[in-house]
């Protein structure tokens, strides 16, 4: 395994980040299923981003409790792997970041999930191809109404009740980027996803965070709770780093979270 870790370091000139990520993932599948390793990998990435994001909020007891629980979950997962295997995870996370930096307009994690052929292992999930999400966003996003909402309130939100890995939200954000060419859309539109599958929540959260989008992803059943309101149990909510920037913090100061979450 150590030799493999070294070989991955030597592949830094190889721009095929997806291939290198899949290679690293499969190296961890000795005694574990591909789905288990994928879920662990994604959970570690999500917790790393989330706990860093809410760290300034840990002065409040409810956020401190969530931070502690996620930190314990991180340690529980990572301790299932050897010291040598643990060295692969930050390298794989870096590959995800590099891929999205070069080609942001894609559903990277959803594509990898389907590429690894692990969807059938988890309730037969199938993620809509990103090109289809792009077409749907272009056809359904009411730019005029969105513009009016932003002009009237200063912000608008986009909600996906079954977000999967976040393809629809990402494609909607690309439409917003084209629409608000005179403004930074990241300061005027926030994105909310919801899914019953925690691995999907993690995937969507990672991608929204790395795309620099303000918002959050809720781990809950959309059939029972279809409205995108912030639940009282904040452990179910995964806030993106942009959600805590000064712009959105001030908006929450002037508008209650209950109103902002509608």
Label each PLM-derived region with a short phrase.
Residues 21, 25, 78, 117, ...:
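Generic alpha-helical secondary structure signal
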Residues 229-262:
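SAM/dcSAM-binding transferase cores
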Residues 2-180:
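Class I S-adenosyl-L-methionine
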Residues 132-238:
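Conserved S-adenosyl-L-methionine
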């Amino acid at each position: 395994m150590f030799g493999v870790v070294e070989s991955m370091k030597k592949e830094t000139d190889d721009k095929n980040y997806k291939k290198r990520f899949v290679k690293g993932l499969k190296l961890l599948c000795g005694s574990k299923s591909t789905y288990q390793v994928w879920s662990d990998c994604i959970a570690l990435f999500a917790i790393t981003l989330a706990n860093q994001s809410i760290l300034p909020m840990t002065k409040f007891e409810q956020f401190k409790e969530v931070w502690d629980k996620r930190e314990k979950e991180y340690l529980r997962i990572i301790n299932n792997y050897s010291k040598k295997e643990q060295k692969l995870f930050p390298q794989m996370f870096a590959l995800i970041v590099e891929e999205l930096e070069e080609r942001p307009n894609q559903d990277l994690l959803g594509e990898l999930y389907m590429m690894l052929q692990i969807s059938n292992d988890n309730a037969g999930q199938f993620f809509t191809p990103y090109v289809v999400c792009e077409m749907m966003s272009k056809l359904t996003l009411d730019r005029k109404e969105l513009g009016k909402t932003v002009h009237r309130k200063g912000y608008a939100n986009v909600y996906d009740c079954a977000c999967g890995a976040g393809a629809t939200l990402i494609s909607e954000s690309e439409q917003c980027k084209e629409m608000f060419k005179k403004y930074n859309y990241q300061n005027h539109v926030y994105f909310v996803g919801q899914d019953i599958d925690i691995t999907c929540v993690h995937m969507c959260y990672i991608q929204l965070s790395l795309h620099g989008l303000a918002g959050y992803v809720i781990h809950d059943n959309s059939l029972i709770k279809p409205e995108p309101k912030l639940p009282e149990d904040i452990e179910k909510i995964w806030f993106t780093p942009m959600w805590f920037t000064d712009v959105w913090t001030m908006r929450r100061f002037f508008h209650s979270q209950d109103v902002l979450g509608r």
